[in-house]
Amino acid sequence: REAFDAGASVMHVHFRMQDEGMGHFPSWDPDLCEEVVDAIRASCPGVIINQTTGVVGPDVSGPIAVIKRIRPEIAACNAGSLNYLKLKKDKSWAWPPMVFDNPVEKIQKMLDAMDETGAHPEFECFDVGIVRSVNMYIENGMAPAAHYNFVMGVASGMPVDAKLLELLLGYKREGAPWQTTLIGRQEIWPVHQRTAELGGMLRTGLEDTFYLPDGERAGGNGVLIEALAQCARNAGRDVASPADARAIMQLGEEQHGSDGVENTSAAR
């Protein structure tokens, strides 16, 4: 609710298992997910729900079942595969090297479920090639329109770099909405500011950073959204209400279906 009051018009939601000691694992229990989303919608009238869908492997039945139950306005669509890697300080692997696999067949299943329920796909782009792939998905007819999320800061993906951001805009479809997800510490904030200046939507949350622009640790999503809203104002833009954001993203009327939350503060 603090994030909503600070200007967040979109809530990106991850669902977690509720059993003791299992809270770091995702849950695709439709009953649980519906309960969470209903509580968010009740507390934050008009807010736009953006559902996570990421799974490793070919089985997408879990996220698809949740899409069909909660009917989010937006659903993430991981638009390409990535070697998901990170090193510790001693240069050993932070976790066993893995592939976040998103072949076209898997993407198509997700897009079909989104089309069936009226959810708008948000294409998660981890590198330049994935941005270009999204353009091909649209040209091929896999999805009607592109909404890009440039994910920067994954250790084996695109770095948080304002110059790279400017290049990416030359590869997306003209006129298509876009935003950045920036992962890191206080070094991400100048790129949030550049996103605002270049006309992108602004997004942050404890999923991506624990730090405010001055390096202080954030006590919650609310203060992060306050800082993000200031980036919009610094760029001469206003913070969009949920109704404004629906119009900007052409989402239509509010959806209703039947725990980490990341928040987007759209600006106009």
Language-model features and meaning:
Residues 3, 14, 75, 134, ...:
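Conserved, mostly hydrophobic/aromatic
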Residues 8-20, 49-53, 123-124, 245:
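Short beta-strand segments at enzyme active-site cores
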Residues 9-34, 152, 210-214:
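Glycine-rich, proline-tolerant flexible connector loops at the mouths of alpha/beta enzymes
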Residues 22-51, 107-114, 167-175, 222-232, ...:
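Alpha-helix-loop-beta-strand connector modules within alpha/beta enzyme cores
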Residues 26-101:
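Active-site beta->alpha loop and helix N-cap motifs at the rims of alpha/beta catalytic domains
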Residues 74-207, 218:
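Catalytic alpha/beta core domains of metabolic enzymes, predominantly
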Residues 87-98, 214-237:
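C-terminal helical cap(s) of enzyme catalytic domains, especially alpha/beta-barrels
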Residues 226, 230-264:
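Mid-to-C-terminal alpha-helical segments outside catalytic/metal-binding sites
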